[in-house]
Swiss-Prot record:
Source species taxonomy: Bacteria, Pseudomonadati, Pseudomonadota, Alphaproteobacteria, Hyphomicrobiales
Domain of life: Bacteria
Record EC number: 7.2.2.20
Biological process according to GO: response to zinc ion
Reaction catalysed by this enzyme: Zn(2+)(out) + ATP(in) + H2O(in) = Zn(2+)(in) + ADP(in) + phosphate(in) + H(+)(in)
Major site of localization recorded for this protein: membrane
Protein name as it appears in the record: Zinc import ATP-binding protein ZnuC
InterPro entries according to UniProt: AAA+_ATPase, ABC_transporter-like_ATP-bd, ABC_transporter-like_CS, Metal_Ion_Import_ABC, P-loop_NTPase
Keyword Repeat belongs to the record: no
Species of origin: Chelativorans sp. (strain BNC1)
Residues at which ATP binds: G45, P46, N47, G48, S49, G50, K51, S52
Length: 283
């Protein structure tokens, strides 16, 4: 088989110039994004930047009003939502949580709980779980469906820093073991997974993209968070060659002001030392 054919077969989702228009405005526009099997792509950006809209287009919940989205035939998606509506006053075990959205094979449930590191909590009430344990339960529920693409919407919300490290490490291990693609929304603009292959910064459009840089392994950092933290979390240095004004217009690097930067080219810095406009963020 030709190499190009193999590469095309590995593509799970491909978006080209995709956008969603609602109530007279673009929620997000001009999105080019590809997720391949075994690849981790992380979306970052402020609230309202179009991260969730982009994910919904990727998995087919929303159809693009312009551009195109192509998915692998019979693509299986495992989805961990940002919020789950649960009546916390009712008794609900982790096992029952796993089957809330459909019947699952008991063996697959057990394997998924084992993979998420919470097999010992199968009969525990969800009300008693910590933030990290609950996120692992949601992750296990997605894994039980043996997805080709794992979609994680802010998977470390409500989790302390140590828990973030453990969850990101788990996500990386799941990718390595199953070969699934991962599309992840990060709640933090500055700290992303070191294992991420591509970081895409959104603000109604793609501002910039690149690979994350590992957190500096200073003695102080290792002392505070442990040696593994530097291998799991990374700082993504990026720069913008334009400025978003309060009225929604955009000031370009040469001083000209335009209505939007949809068609404007954005330089991407893979190294924080490139370009005078680079900003280093340290979580």
């Amino acid at each position: 088989m030709l190499q190009t054919a193999r590469q095309d077969q590995e593509v799970l989702v491909e978006m080209r110039n995709a956008g969603v228009h609602r109530s007279g405005r673009w929620l997000v526009r001009g999105v080019d994004l590809t997720v391949r099997r075994g690849e981790i792509v992380t979306l970052i950006g402020p609230n309202g930047s179009g991260k969730s809209t982009t994910v919904k287009m990727a998995i087919g919940v929303l159809q693009p009003d312009e551009g195109a989205v192509r998915r692998m035939p019979s693509l299986k998606v495992g989805y961990v939502p940002q919020k789950v509506s649960i009546d916390w006053t009712l008794p609900l075990s982790v096992e029952r949580l796993m089957a809330l959205t459909g019947t699952l094979d008991r063996k697959k449930v057990g394997e998924a709980l084992e993979a998420a590191g919470i097999a010992h909590l199968a009969r525990a009430e969800v009300q008693t779980l910590s933030g990290g344990e609950f996120q692992r339960a949601l992750l296990a529920r997605a894994l039980a469906r043996e997805p080709d693409l794992l979609v994680l919407d802010e998977p470390v919300q409500g989790v302390d820093f140590t828990g973030e490290i453990a969850l990101y490490q788990l996500i990386s291990e799941i990718r390595d073991r199953t070969g699934c693609g991962v599309l992840l929304i990060s709640h933090d603009l500055h700290v992303v997974m070191a294992a991420t292959d591509t970081v895409i910064c959104l603000n109604g459009h793609i501002c910039c993209r690149g690979t994350p840089e590992k957190v500096l392994k200073s003695p102080e950092y290792v002392r505070l968070f442990g040696a593994r933290a530097g291998d799991t979390l990374a700082i993504y240095h990026h720069h913008h060659d334009h400025t978003h004004l309060a009225d929604g217009r955009v000031r370009q690097a040469d001083g000209t002001i335009v209505d939007d930067c949809h068609a404007h080219h954005h330089d991407h810095a893979r190294d924080g030392g490139q370009g005078g406009g680079g900003h280093g963020h340290a979580g």
